[in-house]
C-alpha cells in the first residue's frame, strides 16, 4: 500500500528493497533522505547515483547548470576547459560535458566522492 502522505514515485522499488516497511517508514520519519534510499536522482536528464558519501543534487543547482550551458554556448565558439571543484556526485561535470564542447576536470578532496563521481561518469557515458 502506497501512503498518500509520502511523495516517493519509487515506493514499490523501496518496499522491495527494504522488505520491512515499518523500518522504511521509520527512516523516512527521521528525515533520512529518500534519495539515499532509492540510490539515485535525475539531474539535467542524467541518472546520478547518490549515497551518504555525496550530497544530493539540488534543483537550484540544475538551474545554475542550465544557465551556465546557455551562457557558454553564447560566449564561446571553441572547445572550452572547465574545472568542477568539489565535484561530489559529479552531476555538474557530467551535465556540462554532455551539453558543451568541452574538456571537463572534476576534483574533490574526498576519495569516496570521486568514486561516486567516476561511477556516475561511466553510467552516463561521459
For each of these PLM feature ranges, what is it?
Residues 1-126:
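Auxiliary N-terminal substrate/complex-recognition segments of SAM-dependent methyltransferases
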